[in-house]
Structures are given as structure tokens and as C-alpha cells.
């Protein structure tokens, strides 16, 4: 009797799809460094193809540049610089505005395929901290998923339904 019950339980577990989230690669980087970061998109929205990825760039990130993606239209939205930007500009950086959001849209990533959306950025010089890059994933039919939740102290990101892609900042 135990064997059929175990097999039935295993069958139920196999029928439940694994929940995959938009993630950031690498998962960690030296604080203050320049990083090639890839937003990994493992699926669409309940079977619908992904047609838009928008990533929010936190204030204080002075360098953020997207990699163009063939077949996708690229938009860079900007915001006025923070006061801290003046000190950053004194070190040879001449951007007049900070990048606020990077959007790839107009392409089509089927639900059963995987892809990466790449950007280069200088991560904050905050050893021991975590950089969160909230992402909104738009799909055919108007559905969207906001991957923007941050874990509370003591909580793990994998416990959240829609965790924001994150990168740990290590000492140099």
C-alpha cells in the first residue's frame, strides 16, 4: 500500500510546475565595481509570450547601459541627478541625468523559451548590501508580472511570490 501512495504523491509533485523567477546574474559582485549583469527571464506569463521587460534603476547608480537586443526596441528613461551626482561627476563622469528605467519591448519571447536582457552598471560601493533591480515583465494579452518584492529581515527571497532580482555586494 505504501508504494502506490508514494508514487501517487510523487506524481502530484511532478505535475506542479516549478516556479521560476526573473533573476540577476551574477548573484554577487564586488561593491563599487562595474558589472555585466543579465536579467534572466525563464518563462512568460501563464503561457503568454513576453513582449516587454522594464528594469528600474535605483537612485545612486550613476552608470547603467543596456545591451541592444535584436528584434527589440530599446528605451532609456532618465531622471535629474541627485546632489551626490556632482561629486561623482568630479571623478570624470559627465552624465547630466541618471538612468531611471531601461525598457526592452516589441520583441517576442515565447513562454517555453528562455532569454537574457543584459546591462552594464556600476554597483553601489556598499559592501554587505544588496542591490535590488525591480523588473516588470509584460506579456501578450496585456498581462504583466511585477518582480519587485524585497524580503523582510530574516525572510528569504525564495519565500516571496514575485521577488525583485538581486545582487549581493561583496567587499573588494
Residue ranges, per PLM feature:
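Bacterial N-terminal signal peptides that target proteins for export
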Residues: 1-7
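N-terminal signal peptide c-region/cleavage motif recognized by signal peptidases
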Residues: 15-17
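Extracytoplasmic/periplasmic copper-protein system
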Residues: 31, 138-172
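Low-complexity, serine/threonine/proline/glycine-rich extracellular segments that form mucin-like
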Residues: 34-70
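A surface/secretory-pathway sequence property marking extracellular, secreted
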Residues: 61-98, 165-171
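Low-complexity, intrinsically disordered segments enriched in Ser/Thr together with acidic residues
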Residues: 102-129
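Short, surface-exposed ligand- or partner-binding patches at beta-edge/loop junctions that are enriched
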Residues: 127-137
